Amino acid sequence: KIKIHKFEKLNKILNKDVDLIVLAVSSKGIEWAGERLLEIFQKKIPNILLLTKGLSIYNDNYELLVDKLSRSLLSKGEIEFNISALGGPSLARGLANRVHTSVVLANNDIQKAKELSKLLNNYYYHVNVSDDLVGVEVSAAIKNIYSMAIGAAKGICKKNVSGEIKDKDYLNSASALVNQAVYEMKIFVKFLKGKEETVNGLAGIGDLYVSSAGGRNSKMGSYLGDGMTYSFAKKNQMQNVTVEAADLAFEIGEKIKKDFQQKDLPLMISVINAITKDEKLNVKWELFNYL
């Protein structure tokens, strides 16, 4: 049974015997959440499960959101805590309707991941476990950028043809974009010391599929594919909608372009340029990996 309480009662609720704290704040709210937890706990915080997906830049390095939260929790001295992260395809409406859903819970300690999975598993919610916290976190974040690119497939599949042809024949192009997305995700995950094989799982391909099939990032991608600039599409089509891929591109885009040449990550950098430079999407098909 779910009980909903006002935020003002948070202190009272968390001071009870708590098994797990689930954080689902926005990426910009990570430090705020850390501050609130430190107001309640002084020596030890119950197990934390982070649902937020994203990456940050700290001291010119990529920072996982679990590390950002850890840094916030340690800002006032030593305190005991353990943070896990959740990844995988889990659209809210489907979950609310209790359709079969598979996710992956990651913790550097696989035994801790297994322990927490037992709290969450039920007849429709299936929790896999992983000790590749980096791979799960990074895959979950960057798949938003790639789902935007795949969402553009219908518009960019071929120039100067009718909309009818694009509507019927864009799937070849979408598949090529998916293949390139997975290839690049593995490069980036490996660069950040995660496991390439994690991209093949729920946090990578699984979440990429769901996001590309109709999420907010894919929707923005469709507008970019139609030739709109990001600012025009945001203002006229998605003004009050959060587009996670755009937030991530602004956060890590410049760092990406310092660390990689366009030939290394041609699809990601094409999307980053379209967003951060506010230019029309120009996918460099000729740079794709066809090995």
Task: Annotate each predicted stretch with a short phrase.
Residues 55-58, 136-137, 210, 241:
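Short, small-residue-enriched loops and turns at beta-alpha junctions
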Residues 37, 69, 184-189, 252:
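Hydrophobic alpha-helical packing residues
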Residues 3-11, 15-98, 116:
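Rossmann-like NAD(P)(H) cofactor-binding subdomain of soluble oxidoreductases
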Residues 143, 150-158, 168-169, 175, ...:
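NAD(P)-dependent Rossmann-like dehydrogenase/reductase catalytic/cofactor-binding core
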Residues 50, 86, 141-142, 205:
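Alpha-helical architecture
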Residues 27-31, 127-130, 271:
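Glycine-rich anion/phosphate-binding loops
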Residues 40, 74-82, 100-197:
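Internal alpha-helical scaffold of NAD(P)-dependent oxidoreductase catalytic cores
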